[in-house]
Amino acid sequence: MSTAVQVDDVMRYRDSRFQTIAAKLLPTQYLVVDDDTALTTTLGSCVAACLRDPVLKIGGMNHFLLPEGQVGDGAPTRYGSYAMELLINDMLKRGAHRKRIEAKVFGGANVLKGFTSNPVGTRNAEFVRQYLQAEHIPIIAEDLCGIHPRKVWFFATTGRVVVQRLPHAHEAEVAATESAVRARLSKAPVTGGVELFE
């Protein structure tokens, strides 16, 4: 089974809905797989990018909290720019070809109260679209913005994605989880680097 190249371990469990092993990604995590593992996450204002090389049938998902940060900010994996580089580079290391990579992107809901003039969900959605366009990675499917949290399942070998929009009752729970992660990461020390592949 494929493993995450990150300090945090990705939780795996048996998903009864799809009768397969699932890997649940939390904010700041990513995972690349080349098997039938379902990559899953729950999103509020965060965004998940699902990338895939359809020839190799390899793919991965990330889950980021904010588009970009300042130099010296803690926990760089919370930022989309860093999370996207990690995901793309891991796929390239495993043999994916940049010109074949395609994307499906999800999340960016405006569920956090008090962020009305420039909501973080909208900024995350704009970031992922602009980033992928700059990298010449086509977005072949998206479900971004709006007001509902989402649960996403991504099957890398087939490219199938299932999105379940969660009822408003889950908004407070998802928003509280994202806010708690943001607070914890703002105090985290800066570590690691990114190796870029062309």
UniProtKB/Swiss-Prot annotation:
Coiled coil: none annotated. It catalyses: L-glutaminyl-[protein] + H2O = L-glutamyl-[protein] + NH4(+). Keywords: Chemotaxis, Hydrolase. It comes from the Bacteria. Pfam families: CheD. Belongs to the CheD family. This is Probable chemoreceptor glutamine deamidase CheD. It comes from Xanthomonas axonopodis pv. citri (strain 306).
